[in-house]
């Protein structure tokens, strides 16, 4: 396949068009008066959303160089989503601003390698200021405020705050569809462990890259499954029940994984394999907890129990299982009495142990078994509304968890402007090109506030000018048009979200500016069609 190669300004300018196209589509969603974007889906109804990463993911441009530029900015949004779970639109806006202004300097002859040094230095300095200015999330009201800002819906904010109150700040909260038109909060017994599927080929929902199973059978063992022959009698029994199967084992040989995946893809049976959490004695204890929760018999290798002896009676079951890349959530229980008895047993151990490590481990296990799993059930009148609402709640939930991790800063883009005012005379360098890189980051700190003002229909230059001289913690409420104390009004952002958005934007921008060549595949030339000869003979 032939390739097209473009160099220096030609390559960067082509990719910049893609950056602008993607950023234009994403930036309209920012702020309390941000709009939605409609995404065509290959099946089902269109998706209406204001989620930056969902929009960026769908953008594919015809021109290969423009598409490369768009995909680079998508990486900013995606990485921010992976780290913080929200802030993807802010990350995209920051990245575009840094790239556009950085390009202007490079085109004028600035050294992009030295500019990169300035970009990295300034972004780290801003990130440190954000952490310094961060406030701990202390009240349920703080949690509700973060969720409300992220979802633009006070009802959703209250629902998430209630969920965290019931299962704890480190508890498990899932989002599911409701059978009614109303939103509901449901709390079940259950737990989560930090191991996901052993192969992505087990995934049934490719959008979320996860597997959901209702009422699955569950095998719990600390043994290694080497091939399907040793559990074949069990699989044949499971097949007759027509129920899905979750395997939790210490490890799997590649042969066993390949056989399971092949049977899953062929539709022979619905199965997902995960590794057992923990190591050594801790692994055995956690598997015993899972066995109690699910009603399974723990097949312990230390007791010389053979996998070939397994029967369907040895398997447990549970209301629902959600398996993701890095974790598995078990929702429900087989017996409340058994779970309560297990919790009491662990509490007795906790009272008798003197080891700080053991105390910490036992508290974690008690918390996992006793706090349960909260499920926010989303109701809506149409499929399109349901999809959009679910995305909003998932974003708000991620933002809230990020706030619990690192605290909160003033929202509405004000935190970045405050960081600018604090650092504008501190982050300096005598090297002209390094200073230009610093300026690229510093000047980009106004971009989110600027876009919020534009989306709300206000004069962005006036808003930014007032924000620069505003009292600390005061900012612009784009919903009402008032200048308010952001913490008192509940206009706050998770520090982790804002910090991750900035650092990811700076990272990709620096790489973009140091790009000197681009290589893409040439579009295939369509073969000229042969003329069709008329049918029939002579008359």
Segments (PLM) and residue ranges:
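N-terminal, positively charged regions that mediate nucleic acid binding
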Residues: 1-43, 538-539
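Short, hydrophobic/aliphatic alpha-helical segments
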Residues: 14-24, 66-82, 236-239, 364, ...
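Residue-level signature of catalytic and energy-coupling elements of molecular machines
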Residues: 15, 31, 85, 109, ...
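Conserved phosphate/anionic-ligand binding catalytic regions in large, soluble enzymes, centered on
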Residues: 26-36, 77-95, 152-177, 372, ...
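Glycine-rich oxoanion-binding loops at beta->alpha junctions
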Residues: 45-81, 198-209, 220-233
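Extended, low-charge hydrophobic alpha-helical regions
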Residues: 60, 66, 376-539
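A structural-propensity feature for long, helix-poor, extended segments
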Residues: 105-149, 212-215, 309-333, 428-488, ...
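Long, structured protein-protein interaction/assembly regions in large complexes
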Residues: 127-406, 410, 523-539
């Amino acid at each position: 396949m032939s390739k097209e190669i473009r160099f220096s300004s030609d390559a960067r300018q082509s990719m910049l068009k893609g950056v602008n196209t993607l950023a234009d589509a994403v930036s309209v969603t920012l702020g309390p008066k941000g709009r939605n974007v409609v995404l065509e889906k290959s099946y089902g109804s269109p998706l209406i959303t204001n989620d930056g990463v969902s929009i960026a993911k769908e953008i594919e441009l015809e021109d290969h160089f423009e598409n490369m530029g768009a995909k680079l900015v998508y990486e900013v949004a995606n990485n921010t989503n992976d780290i913080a779970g929200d802030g993807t639109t802010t990350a995209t806006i920051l990245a575009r601003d840094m790239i556009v202004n950085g390009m202007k300097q490079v085109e004028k002859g600035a050294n992009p390698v030295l500019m990169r040094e300035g970009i990295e230095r300034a972004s780290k300095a801003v990130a440190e200021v954000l952490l310094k200015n961060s406030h701990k999330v202390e009240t349920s009201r703080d949690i509700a405020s973060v969720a409300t800002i992220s979802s633009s819906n006070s009802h959703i904010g209250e629902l998430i705050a209630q969920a965290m109150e019931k299962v704890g700040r480190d508890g498990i909260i899932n989002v599911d569809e409701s059978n009614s038109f109303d939103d509901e909060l449901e709390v079940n017994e259950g737990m989560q462990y930090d191991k996901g599927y052993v192969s992505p080929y087990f995934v049934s929902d490719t959008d979320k890259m996860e597997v959901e199973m209702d009422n699955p059978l569950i095998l719990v063992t600390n043994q290694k499954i080497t091939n399907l022959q040793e559990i074949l009698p069990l699989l044949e029994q499971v097949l007759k029940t027509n129920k899905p199967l979750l395997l939790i084992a210490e490890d799997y040989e590649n042969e066993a994984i390949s056989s399971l995946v092949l049977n899953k893809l062929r539709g022979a049976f619905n199965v997902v394999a995960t590794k057992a959490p923990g190591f050594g004695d801790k692994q055995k204890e956690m598997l015993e907890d899972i066995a109690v929760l699910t009603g399974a018999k723990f097949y312990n290798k230390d007791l010389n129990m053979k996998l070939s002896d397994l029967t369907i009676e040895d398997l447990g079951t549970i209301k629902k299982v959600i398996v993701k890349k890095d974790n598995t959530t078990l929702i429900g229980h087989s017996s409340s009495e058994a779970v309560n008895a297990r919790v009491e047993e662990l509490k007795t151990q906790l009272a008798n142990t003197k080891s700080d490590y053991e105390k910490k481990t036992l508290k974690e296990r008690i918390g996992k078994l006793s706090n349960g799993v909260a499920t926010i059930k989303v109701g809506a009148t149409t499929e399109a509304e349901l999809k959009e609402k679910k995305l909003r709640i998932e974003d708000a939930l991620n933002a809230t968890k990020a706030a619990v991790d690192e605290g909160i800063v003033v929202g509405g883009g004000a935190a970045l402007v405050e960081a600018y005012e604090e650092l504008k005379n501190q982050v300096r360098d005598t090297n002209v090109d390094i200073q230009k890189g610093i300026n690229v980051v510093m000047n980009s700190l106004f971009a989110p506030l600027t876009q919020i003002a534009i989306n709300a229909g206000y004069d962005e230059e006036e808003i930014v000018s007032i924000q620069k001289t505003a009292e600390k913690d005061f900012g612009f409420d784009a919903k009402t048009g008032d200048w308010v104390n952001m913490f008192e009004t509940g206009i706050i952002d998770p520090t982790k979200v804002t910090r991750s958005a900035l650092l990811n934007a700076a990272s990709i921008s620096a790489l973009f500016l140091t790009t000197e060549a681009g290589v893409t595949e040439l579009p295939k030339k369509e073969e000229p069609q042969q003329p069709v000869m008329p049918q029939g003979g002579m008359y």
